[in-house]
Amino acid sequence: MKKVIAGVSASLFMLMSNLAHADGECDKYKTSYDKTYCMAKIFMEADKELNTVYSELRGVLKDDLKKQLTETQRAWLKYRDSSCEQSGSIDVSCNYKVNKERTDYLRDRLRECKAGTCRNELIAQKNWG
């Protein structure tokens, strides 16, 4: 079991190294365990932010647009997973970047909708790839 945990930790560390260098927040840690924990936390926070913005946007939409947003988000998740996959494993740096881009896009739509200028075509738009 310890070998499995060590292997997973090492793999996660290697996959997330680009993310850590991009943000620089995890460079201060000396052990690979601490760096892995730090990087995993950054990634999880970005994913949580995406889910929060998505939920907020759904909350201001009418039912027909909620359905369109759900369908578009499912298609985006497939895009993200396929575009960030390398040799059977997920490229966490890519996943982080793509998540942040989607979060920004959804946040822009949320601002528009809250301002009363919600444009249906942008909610359903598949603006990636």
Regions found by a protein language model. Give the residues of each.
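Bacterial N-terminal signal peptides that target proteins for export
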Residues: 1-8, 12
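N-terminal signal peptide c-region/cleavage motif recognized by signal peptidases
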Residues: 15-19
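N-terminal alpha-helical modules
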Residues: 21-129
